[in-house]
Structure formats: C-alpha cells, structure tokens
C-alpha cells in the first residue's frame, strides 16, 4: 500500500503537465475522489462489503493515512456518511490509471477548499445524489481555475484587449514611401492613361507637358488645403493664396505663350497633367491675362509716345532741310523783295553774329 506523501508528488506533476481541455474531466473525477484523503480517520482492515467493492472498482483513490497534515477536522456525524453505512476503504490506485490520466488539470488549484469533496457512501443511491449535488459546484470551480490560469499568462492578458486593427483599414505598405518604383506603380494605377491618349482635339500645350513629368506625382501636387480659409487676429476670414511649384509655373507660362484662353477640355487636361484643379488653372489664367493686358498696354503707350516723338523730330528735320535749301540758294537780284526780307529776318541773328565777328576782326587788325 502506498503512502500519502508518495501520492502527492505524482498528482502535482500531473497538475502541471495536463492540457486545458481536460479540466472538466478532472473536476468530475474530484467529485468522487477526496482532495485531502488524510482528513479522514483510518478505516478497519476487515473485509469490505459488496457495496464498497462496487464503488471502489468504479473510483480508485489513494489509501487513507492516520496523519492529518492539513489540520482539517474529520467530517461531522450528520453528513452523508451518517446514513447507517460506515465509510469505505477504497482500493489503492497507481498514477498511471485511466482516471489519473484524465484527471490532470491545466494549472494547480490555488485553494483546495474550492473543490468540495463528497464522502463515499455504501449505497448506490447516496453516491448518485452526491454526484448530482456537487456537479454544479465542481464545474464552477473548474471554470474559475481556467480563468485564473488564462489571466496569469501574458497571452491571456493580451487576449482580453480589443483589437483595433480589425476596425481601422490596413496601413499602406512601407515600400510605397521608401521605394520610388512602388510610388511610380501607384501613380500609374491612379492615372492609367497618359495625356496624349485622352480623347479630344489636338492639344496645344507645351510639348513637355505631354510627357510624364516628375510633378505629375500626387505628392507634389497642389492640394485644396493650400487655399483654405484661416482666421485673422480679429476673427475675420483670411484667404491664403495657393503656392505652385516652379515646374508647374513653367508649364503654365509655356502654355500661356501659345494661347491666352483655354476651353473646358483643354483646361481639364492641363490641370490633370500638372496635378492641379480646374479652378486653380482657370484663376491662374485670369490673373495672367490681367497682368499681360497691363503690361501690353504699358508697352503700347511707351511705343506710341516714342513714335510721336520720332514723328515730331522727323517733321522738324524736314522743315529745317527745306529752309536750308532755300537759304543755300544764291540770291537773285531780280527776285521778289519779300523773299529776301524773310530770309534776312530768319537769319538775322546769324547775320548779326557774322557782322560782329567782322567788326572785331577789323578792330584787331
């Protein structure tokens, strides 16, 4: 016959090496096998009765000892064993029995009092009633033990947390941000057709726009948030002007050199090719036309003023040439006196200076 201490070691190892699905079977086996067999007094060594032999064959348990290690009191006389039949002496069991193999729980129970043990009785009716009475409490204790085991492990703690990844959309792959080829593939998927394949008339844009420029990338495109409404110090709305990249302005200027006005489809194609909105292209062309008109008007005014001054200069030069021609002609004594008088009046100052120089020359001589 085995001792009680020799039986406790295999049971502890069985507690640690078992699997979680066998916890319920263990609880059902504990209903028939007392957890602390040393709490009961030693039984006489007389021959067992017929009822005890039947119950011992159905539920083997370790032999009972005389020592009470837990300090537990023996059951009261008013319990299930007080029905007239004395307690039975159960047959010795080995740790390799089928009931021991099936009764291995997942983790050792923290408190032995959580699993109530029923006292064996001699009659089959008392054993069935005790099994039905303790089935609910044993199932609850097994569930509590499984919950404690799950809570003690890190996986059990993390399993209770909500999984937000199922609620939010999956993040984009990191290669989209760190791989230019992946970004190019994404851009091609976003814009499947190039600008030249779009339906419509022959485009009039700058030829560089027809090819796939680097500013076609969505990351370099102007977003509507750039023209968002901000609040000033006084709480008034403050409209910010959108900022365009140098490549976009260069393409817009080249297109404006060819045409000052864009139709709807042309404006849509240009906005699509530059990554801008149609309203941004429309407003840019309006402002550019206004600037061009002012500059053109100033240039025209300057040219007109220059032309007028040139005309006046040419007119004065022609009059002087005519006068010089009349002056250089030799005087005819038989000509009209009026003509001679006009020539003298016109060149009076020059003639006076000549007379003055002649008089000075005579005085010096």
UniProtKB/Swiss-Prot annotation:
Q: Where is the composition biased (Basic and acidic residues)?
A: 305-318
Descriptive protein name: Homeobox protein Nkx-6.1
Question: Which GO CC terms are listed, alphabetically?
Answer: nucleus
Annotated localization = Nucleus
Query: Per the record, what about its domains?
Result: The C-terminal domain contributes to sequence-specific DNA-binding.
Identify the stretch(es) annotated as Disordered: 35-136, 295-365
Biased region (Low complexity) positions are: 48-59, 69-92, 110-136
Extract the ranges annotated as region (Involved in DNA-binding). Answer: 307-365
GO molecular function terms noted in the UniProt entry: chromatin binding; DNA-binding transcription factor activity; DNA-binding transcription factor activity, RNA polymerase II-specific; DNA-binding transcription repressor activity, RNA polymerase II-specific; RNA polymerase II cis-regulatory region sequence-specific DNA binding; sequence-specific DNA binding
Matching entries from InterPro entries are given as: HD (IPR001356), HD_metazoa (IPR020479), Homeobox_CS (IPR017970), Homeobox_NK-like (IPR050394), Homeodomain-like_sf (IPR009057), HTH_motif (IPR000047)
Chain positions covered by the region annotation Repressor domain:
102-269
Major localisation:
nucleus
Expression across tissues is: Pancreatic beta cells.
- At what positions is Asymmetric dimethylarginine found? 190
């Amino acid at each position: 016959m085995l001792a009680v201490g020799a039986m406790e070691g295999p049971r502890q190892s069985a507690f640690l090496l078992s699997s979680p699905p066998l916890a319920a079977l263990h609880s059902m086996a504990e209903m028939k096998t007392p957890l602390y067999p040393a709490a009961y007094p030693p039984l006489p060594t007389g021959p067992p009765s017929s009822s005890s032999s039947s119950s011992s064959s159905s539920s083997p348990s370790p032999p009972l000892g005389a020592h009470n290690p837990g300090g537990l009191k023996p059951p009261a006389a008013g319990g299930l064993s007080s029905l007239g039949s004395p307690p039975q002496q159960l047959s010795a069991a080995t740790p390799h029995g089928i009931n021991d193999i099936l009764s291995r729980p997942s983790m050792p129970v923290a408190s032995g009092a959580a699993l109530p043990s029923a006292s064996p009785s001699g009659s089959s009716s008392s054993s069935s009633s005790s099994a039905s009475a303790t089935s609910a409490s044993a199932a609850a204790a097994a569930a509590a033990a499984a919950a404690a085991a799950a809570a003690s492990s890190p996986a059990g703690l993390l399993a209770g947390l909500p999984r937000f990844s199922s609620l939010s959309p999956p993040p984009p792959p990191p290669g989209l941000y760190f791989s230019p080829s992946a970004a190019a593939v994404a851009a091609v998927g976003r814009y499947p057709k190039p600008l030249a394949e779009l339906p419509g008339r022959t485009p009039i844009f700058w030829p560089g726009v027809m090819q796939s420029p680097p500013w076609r990338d969505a990351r370099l495109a102007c977003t509507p948030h750039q023209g968002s409404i901000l609040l000033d110090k006084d709480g008034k709305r403050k409209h910010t002007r959108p900022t365009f990249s140098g490549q976009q302005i260069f393409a817009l200027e080249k297109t404006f050199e060819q045409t000052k006005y864009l139709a709807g489809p042309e404006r849509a194609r240009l906005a699509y090719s530059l990554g801008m909105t149609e309203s941004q292209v429309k407003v840019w062309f309006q402002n550019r036309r206004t600037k061009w008109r002012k500059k053109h008007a100033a240039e025209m005014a300057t040219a007109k003023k220059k032309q007028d001054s040139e005309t006046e200069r040419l007119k004065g030069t022609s009059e002087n040439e005519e006068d010089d021609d009349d002056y250089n002609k030799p005087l005819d004594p038989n000509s009209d006196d009026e003509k001679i008088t006009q020539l003298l009046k016109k060149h009076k100052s020059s003639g006076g200076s000549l007379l003055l120089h002649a008089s000075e020359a005579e005085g010096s001589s």
